[in-house]
Amino acid sequence: LDLGKQLMPIGMLVVLDSILNRITQNRAKGRNTFIFIDEIYLLFQHEYSANFLFTLWKRVRKYGAYATGITQNVDDLLQSHTARTMLANSEFIIMLNQASTDRLELAKLLNISDLQMSYITNVEAGHGLIKVGSSLVPFANKFPKNTKLYKLMTTKPNEKF
């Protein structure tokens, strides 16, 4: 759906408000809410949605919700001061192979050592670095391609069921 530049902020407001309403409804029912925002950097291109998301990010856990932001190019995300603050204060971050400029920015923001940087530099799919609190842990998440689990988890369309 292409709303164009004029209607995009209004469209985002409607969607974000709907998410907040669902979180509130689920809390009243004793349910957790899991929010996955793909290409999250797009929300930081508009001041209102960036501020709304910043507030939501800080409050959702109190409402039994868990927010996950996803982006392939961290550099796009880090253009926003609000996004940088959110990323720096996030307790859990998964980093896969990163482009050179993205690695440098992440290293500065998250205090990643040169050795730790090697885990997100020219690595195979499924390898990377996890930030949990103040700890950084390397990981290798390899599954045989001929398994159902692999077919469920792969992001490659030609390898899905």
Q: Across the structure, where does each feature detected by a protein language model lie?
A:
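Conserved P-loop NTPase motor cores
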Residues: 2-120, 145
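Conserved P-loop NTPase
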Residues: 110-161
